[in-house]
Structures are given as C-alpha cells and as structure tokens.
Amino acid sequence: MDKTQLKRHDLVYPSSIGRARLKQVFLNELTGEKAFLAADIFRVDSVIPGIVRRAEVLSADVIPLGFVHPQLCEGRRLRLTAELEVGEAVKLKRPYELAAAEFKVSTNCLAAAQAVCSYAAERRLKLGILGSAGLEIATGLPFTNSESDLDLLITGLSLQQLQEVYTELQAIGKKFQVDIDLETELINGYGIKAAELFQPTQTVLGKSLQDVQILKKKTVVEILSQEA
C-alpha cells in the first residue's frame, strides 16, 4: 500500500498478522472489558477497519489508525489509537465507496444516509459517509443508534453548489430527525466543515493528515471554484 495516497477518513484493513500483533499490544496494556473489546476488534476474522488519523511524528513505514468497537464500554465507545506497519495493510476503502454500497437500514441515522445516498446518486455528487454510519455500512455491525449523527464528506463543488447541497442535506436530516454534518475535502488534502464556509468570517479551520491550519476563506473559495 502506498502510504502517500492515504487521506483523512480512509478505512484501512489490517492483515491477520497485523491484527494479531495489535491484539497482543492492547492485551498487554488493557484489562477487563476494555481488553475483551480490544481483542474482539483485532480478531483474525474481524471486519473492523482502522480509520486513518493524524499523528505528530511517525516513520515512513507506519500508518497511524484509530479503531472503534460498536459496543459501548462504560457508556462510551472504546477508541484505540494504533500504528500499523505499511506491509500489514491489505485493503483501503475511501468514504466515497461507502455511499455506493448496499446496506440495511436499522436506525434513523442509516435511513437518512440512504436518502442522502439516493440524492447524491441522482445528482452525480461525489459524496462519502463517515463516522458511525460509515463504519456500520463498511462492516454490517451496529455502530449507529438512536442518538447517532450523520457525518458526510463531499468534494468537487463550488461554494454556491456546496451551499445548495448543504441546504438539501439539512432538509433530509430534519425529515429523519438526524443532525447532518458535512465536510468538504479539498484537493490539497485539507478538510473543512461546510457550515464554517457560510459564516461571516474571513478564515476557516482546515484539517489534514499533517496539521491543522487557519486558512483564508478567500483562498478556499478559489480552490473550490477550480475543483468544481
């Protein structure tokens, strides 16, 4: 796997060797229910991927990932940060692929996701599914519940187009009583909350795998126009 091609929110699947190694790492660090859930995440036959995350300093042959178990532990998700060796990664899946996948609707969050995917397909939008909904679509495991929000990723739209799509997505969210959060992905690797672009400010917060920066909104709008 070419690590340089990875972007925020990408799903990376470890090999059986990688899972076995990470399982041992966390069994040495955790106890009780947390150790049990960690062992489940890193079972050889587990379908739970890691989510690419930002890390301060890492060698070139390591991929920083975050793993989540669908079961709550002490009232919250068990979130584990891990370092996977590049050679231990066997599959990559981008959030945009999840929007084209078939999935069972078990919660309002996924019902909203289904409606959003249909809307995006009709308009040929490049839209991706993130967060708990993305993990449930990717794995078939119950990551969403009655309180889940729907996190989305989109690219290839000008500011005006983005605002039109954002309005439609908020209407879908209202219909299913689900909060929808939309992030736009720029070609330079930065992700920006769409809602920030519509606020009367001169700057927005941009997040990439390398850093977090305050970006000039004018510059971001120019990039969006070039990508549309």
Sequence positions of predicted segments:
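Flexible, glycine-rich phosphate/dinucleotide-binding loops
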Residues: 74, 136, 189
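Short, charged/polar "capping" segments at the starts of alpha-helices
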Residues: 161-162, 190
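Polyanionic, low-complexity intrinsically disordered segments
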Residues: 220-227
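Conserved catalytic core of two-metal-ion nucleotidyltransferases
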Residues: 172-209
